[in-house]
Design a protein with these regions (language model features):
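Extracellular adhesion/carbohydrate-binding repeat motifs centered on closely spaced tryptophans
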Residues: 2-501
Length: 501
């Protein structure tokens, strides 16, 4: 804002100045001396001193020497302009009265003189539709300001001064300026950026609670210093205190255990609470800042597997968690920190294997070229509700599957065994497959069995017209040599062979 310092025209004295009168005398009135200084004489022809005189609707001041003051303070409360008239309803940028005689002082400040000419001081005042604050000496306040009740305002630059509202990008305040915020720029452990976004309500009060706030229909997160938080945020609640949301990267013990505390807001230019899909770097506090992955957020919280035993992949040498979660009618897989997973995944809650394509969508039916242990296999996933997407176990369209994986011989034929029930005591069914996984059931054909122990060109008996080998006709040696299936995950970090889970 550029304040306009209005110089009023003096109807009597100023008119004489304009006409260049050399010396004008009145029975009672104004008189200009040879030095060009105006004086006022009363009806007794006495020079008036130390008084205000009104002329043409304006007030003028005669000092102790009877000289009309110009561009000067009067009693540290009033100010007369260059024409000598008292300033009324007017801004003036000048030195304080006590500093006027110090030519080296450059500490000018703005003052406002009201309808009676007195400076406004130790108060707030609405001027031209905007609210300003003045200190006990009448100086207009600017920048960060904290009132006696601990409310924090921002009053613009030194030539602005009006109380701000809405969003402002500002340098973080010094602790001395705003003690209520407790922010210390010199403290390396301070959680604020040097600059950031701050929110000021319509009454100018800054929001300074470590919590979320709805602004113009969107939620934003703030720390206890009032600075808006953005991107990853650790919203851990400290015992006995309100929410103490802090920026990511300040957790004492980073790792997956922090996932439940993490929130996400948009980048600093936006900042509102995230909803929907985001492809972003992970949080420092979950040790994932070097990884870029897809996350799905609802109210700022990532959809994720629970950091608990129910979602833990128990057969993995490393702690891994997986959950199958529906998003907008489609199924996706997420780990314990919310990273979307692709490829073959074991879902503990369903006790089964599922496949998620490169875009994260769960697949059903036949899926070829599933990577596993430096090889690729064909899988089949259920298409029926109730088991939708789960890897099929047993016979399917003339092929043999286990947890979705098609069981095949390496070159010739191989005997596989699958459990009959949920307990090992229930026994096994035995099957014969070729290198394409096709089930065999010819009792007249001789088969080269690659997993046999010294026997080839074997004929088998089958149970009726089924694909099951007649186990009563199988030798103990053949049963012992029958292959059991396995599935490898996580680049060989985990191997699944558990029939009875």
């Amino acid at each position: 804002m550029r304040k306009q310092t209005k110089l009023v025209a003096v109807l009597s004295a100023a008119a004489l100045l304009a006409m260049g009168a050399s010396m004008t005398s009145f029975a009672a009135g104004w008189e200009k001396d040879d030095s060009g200084i105006w004086h006022y004489y009363d009806s007794d022809d006495e020079m008036v001193t130390g008084e205000w005189k009104k002329d043409g609707g304006k007030w003028f001041y005669l000092d102790d020497d009877g000289e009309m003051l110009t561009d000067s303070w009067v009693d540290d409360e009033y100010y007369v302009g260059e024409d000598g008239a008292m300033l009324i309803n007017t801004w003036k940028k000048t030195l304080a009265d006590e500093d006027m005689d110090d030519p080296e002082d450059d500490g000018e400040a703005w003052y406002y003189f009201g309808s009676k000419g007195k400076k406004t001081q130790d108060d707030d005042k609405k001027i031209g539709g905007k609210t300003y604050y003045f200190d006990e000496n009448g100086k207009m306040r600017d920048g960060w300001y904290e009132d006696e009740n601990g409310n924090v305002y921002y009053l613009g630059g030194e030539d602005e001064g009006w109380r701000a509202s809405g969003w402002l990008w500002l340098e973080a305040p010094e602790e001395d300026d705003v003690p209520a915020l407790g922010h210390d720029n010199d403290d390396d452990n301070d959680v604020c950026d040097e600059e950031g976004w701050y929110w000021f309500a319509s009454d100018g009060k800054m929001y300074k609670k470590a919590d979320k706030k709805k602004i113009n229909g969107k939620y934003y997160f703030f720390n206890e210093h009032g600075q808006m938080l953005y991107e990853w945020i650790n919203g851990q609640r400290v015992s006995g205190t309100p929410s103490n949301a802090i920026a990511d990267g300040n957790a004492a013990t980073p790792g997956s255990s922090q996932a439940e505390n993490m929130l996400y807001a948009n980048v600093v230019e936006e900042g509102w609470r995230a909803d929907g899909w985001y492809e972003i770097d992970g949080a420092e506090d979950t040790d994932a800042s070097d990884d870029t992955d897809w996350y799905y957020f609802k109210d700022g919280k990532a959809k994720k597997a629970k950091f608990a035993s129910d979602d833990k992949v128990g057969f993995s040498a490393k702690d891994k968690y997986r959950a199958k979660i529906k998003v907008s009618g489609k199924w996706f897989c997420f780990n314990e920190i919310g990273q979307m997973q692709t490829g073959l995944q074991y879902i503990p809650q369903s006790n089964g294997f599922y496949y998620f394509d490169e875009n994260g969508y769960m697949k059903t039916g036949k899926v070829a070229n599933v990577e596993e242990d430096n090889d690729s296999f064909t899988y089949y996933f259920d298409t029926k509700n109730g088991k939708l997407g789960k890897g099929v176990t047993g016979e399917k369209s003339g092929y043999l599957y286990w947890n979705g994986k098609r069981l095949e011989a390496d070159d010739d034929y191989r005997i596989y065994k699958l459990p009959k029930g949920d307990k090992e005591a229930d026994g096994y069914d035995y099957y014969l497959v070729n290198s394409k996984g096709k089930l065999q059931k010819s009792d007249s054909k001789e088969y080269d069995v690659e997993n046999g122990n010294g026997y080839t060109k074997v004929k088998f008996d089958f149970v009726g017209k089924s694909y099951k080998l007649d186990e009563t006709k199988l030798s103990a040696e053949m049963k012992a040599d029958a292959s059991t299936a396995k599935i490898e995950l996580y680049d060989g970090d985990a191997e699944y062979t558990d029939f009875f889970k």
